[in-house]
Amino acid sequence: CMLYTLPGIPCIYYGDEAGLTGGRDPFNRGCYPWGSEDTDLIGFHKMLGAFRKDAEVLSDGGFYPLSSALGCVAYLRYKAGERRVACIANKNPDTIDYVLNSDMQNMHVFCGGENIGGSVSIPPETACILTD
């Protein structure tokens, strides 16, 4: 989620979109797994790519950091007259409930979390995207 919502151009390493893993040099990437790709993961990347293409704020909007403590990184992308996009990444081994700022209360979850009355529940080692 962060790659698609941070400023700049998303760079997906060869095969990551299909679930390809690697090892140490010189085996850091094997052959593409034609016919055995992780189709759910490919669909997730396609969904994020379409979302980024549709959200102009992710191409040329501002960046405002919200939090970077206790294994949680959160930021807001904004542009006058455009919808806002927030990303909250949970690096913790446990689910977190991220309390939304008062001006973010009306944002809804696009992917990766669940709205719970003024906060967002984010599973372990995942990220959540919110939008207006």
Question: Predicted regions: what is each one?
Answer:
Residues 66-102:
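Carbohydrate-binding surface patches
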Residues 3, 15, 48, 88-90, ...:
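Hydrophobic, well-ordered secondary-structure elements that form the walls
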Residues 1-39:
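Aromatic/acidic polysaccharide-binding cleft in carbohydrate-active enzymes
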Residues 117-132:
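C-terminal beta-strand-rich structural cap/linker in extracellular carbohydrate-active enzymes
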Residues 102-113:
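Solvent-exposed beta-hairpin/edge-strand motifs
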